[in-house]
Amino acid sequence: MQIQCFESITQKYPQFPTALLANEEPIQNGEPFILYGTKLDITKLEKFQQKCGQNFQIFDVWMVAKNIIVLLKGQWFSDFIKFTHDVEVDIAKLDFSPKLSQAGLLVMDMDSTAIQIECIDEIAKLAGVGELVSAITESAMRGELDFEQSLRCRVGTLKGAPESILQQVRENLPLMSGLVETIQTLQKYGWKTAIASGGFTYFADYLKALLQLDFAASNQFDIEDGKLTGLVKGDVVDAQYKAKTLQHLLEEYGIDSRHSIAIGDGANDLAMMNVAGLGVAFHAKPKVQPQAQIVVNFADLTALLCLLSANDRI
């Protein structure tokens, strides 16, 4: 299907650069941006152009993973993001520094970013307090509760639960679609990769080993006699801790902050997004999206490869 979508565009536009509308003068000296998605075809491209009311210049079309990517130039408006919702593709203005060919640093949130679940919610279900903990998690991710306070509250509900339920959750840990391909590709190009998570070491350290990541920071359950005590051991990894982790890794690896990426879905990821050269909100909460540099609503984690490959083409 992706090949058909790709060819529907290249058959109409066999040479670049060219105007989307052949009979009208294109926008001159526009800003570069990309549209991308697994179902991006000529119909979606034309519908987007009609909504925008501009004759964009199209400079390139290529594929990364299963994504079709179109490089355009035009007069940028923030409304473009709303228009892409209607055609179910993603968009990104190319006003950031990181590129695939230049090694940098990626720091990821874990729950609902690197993996498809919120681990503490799954643990709570097995401990019989699922609904209570899920409600607190949602409120915290929306930024309605102080993260540290909400975390200690959620962990407190798990007091007395057997340590074995952590293993049950880890055995069925669903990786986010596109995670493995994205990490392996970045590592191939010399990128450093890390997790900074408000989740727990039992899962973050597992992912670090599985994916051969360079670093992982997360919270630690306090466990005594094979049971959770309901306490968090040591400092809580909150928004500021995540931001400091990213800064520390930049210094340790000698990487310019302009060549770093932070990606996450919750309010507690915004601080590290602001430190990074590129902050990406991934299928994020409504409060988070307007504050992020790039928003991904439809693509999987290979969206990062789309963004980085685009910067290599401008």
UniProtKB/Swiss-Prot annotation:
Cofactor detail note: Binds 1 Mg(2+) ion per subunit.
Protein species of origin: Haemophilus influenzae (strain ATCC 51907 / DSM 11121 / KW20 / Rd)
GO cellular component: cytoplasm
Family membership: Belongs to the HAD-like hydrolase superfamily. SerB family.
Protein name, per record: Phosphoserine phosphatase
Pathway annotation: Amino-acid biosynthesis; L-serine biosynthesis; L-serine from 3-phospho-D-glycerate: step 3/3
InterPro entries assigned: HAD-like_SerB, HAD-like_sf, HAD_sf, PSP, SerB_N
Top-level taxon of origin: Bacteria
Cofactor(s) listed in the protein's UniProt record: Mg(2+)
